[in-house]
Design a protein with these regions (language model features):
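Beta1-alpha1 glycine-rich phosphate/pyrophosphate-binding loop at the start
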Residues: 2-82, 178, 185-229
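FAD-binding core/adjacent interface of flavoenzyme oxidoreductases
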Residues: 2-6, 78-177
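Short hydrophobic core segments
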Residues: 12, 110-120, 254, 272-273
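A Rossmann-like FAD-binding core segment of flavoenzymes
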Residues: 71-97, 195-273
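Internal, well-ordered alpha-helical segments in soluble enzyme and binding-protein domains
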Residues: 143, 147, 174, 187-190, ...
């Protein structure tokens, strides 16, 4: 594919930035290789809708090779490698990529002339004890599906209270409550979507639980939601969430997270499952 006179551009990550770079380089005098551990591109702004069962996961994912094919003739210089980038040797100009074959992992050393890094981001728990073990993050399609399944399993477990004498009322309530930490765009969207899910489909599907209002708490360490947005939008978001039944708590700093919920620095405990 690569000739001595054709530079190779390797792009790590087939997210928005990686695909944008590949499209800009399509048809140019270079060979482009996209590297990603998934063979699909997920539309991350809609992860919260997958997590709350509003849309199916396949509706926000597109195969990377289909995206390349849609580039038409210009995309002939763009290729894709399914694997996970593990490191780069800039002196030798090689990218180490871990691939799987027949269930076995091995490493490839992919040469490059130019390397573009767009691997995305990971959730920062700021060192809060218990967050990694007991909390969910929402950065990938797999995490969104995992959260959705957890919500549904929690409601199924709570519904057993009618036949399970060992389930206490407090345990039943805890399984019906969700806590969202962070009042940015994702947190606001997720809290609102959870409230809609509990007030709508889950209330209809679990009538014996007697849900009268959603049990969703949104914790924000700052003095307002959506920092950086115009004040009128920040105020509207809080009013709207409150009207939907979301318990919005500002200045709420999480000290630790346990299997029973979140514990705040002011001594409060917000129970959830």
């Amino acid at each position: 594919m690569t000739t001595p006179s054709t530079p190779r551009v390797v792009i790590v990550g087939a997210g928005f930035a990686g695909l944008f770079a590949a499209r800009e380089l399509a048809g140019q005098h270079c060979d482009v290789l996209l590297v990603d551990r998934n063979n699909y591109h997920a539309f991350l702004p809609l992860l919260y809708q997958v997590a709350t069962a509003a849309v199916e996961s396949e509706n926000i994912a597109a195969p990377v090779r289909s995206v390349i094919r849609a580039m038409g003739a210009k995309g002939r210089n763009v290729d894709f490698l399914l694997g996970e980038a593990r490191g780069a040797d800039f002196k030798r100009r090689q990218l180490t990529v871990e691939v799987q074959e027949d269930g076995q992992k091995r490493e490839l050393h992919v040469p490059f002339d130019y390397l573009l890094l767009a691997p995305g981001s990971v959730t920062n728990t700021f060192g809060v004890p218990g967050a990694d073990e007991h909390a969910f993050s929402l950065k990938s399609l797999e995490e969104a599906v995992r959260l959705r399944n957890h919500i549904l399993r929690s409601f199924e477990a709570a519904s057993r209270s009618t036949v399970d004498p060992e389930m206490t009322p407090d345990e039943r309530l805890r399984r019906l409550c969700m806590v969202v930490v962070g009042g940015g765009p994702t947190g606001v969207e997720l809290a609102g979507a959870m409230a809609e899910l509990m007030s709508g489909a889950l209330r209809r599907d679990f009538p014996r639980l007697g849900l009268t209002r959603p049990c969703v708490t949104l914790l924000e360490a700052g003095d307002g939601l959506l920092p950086g947005f115009p004040q009128r939008l920040r105020d509207y978001a809080r009013r709207k969430l409150t009207s939907m039944g979301v318990d919005v708590r500002l200045g709420a700093q999480v000290e630790r997270v346990g299997p029973e919920g979140a514990y705040l620095k002011n001594g409060d405990a917000v129970l959830a499952h």
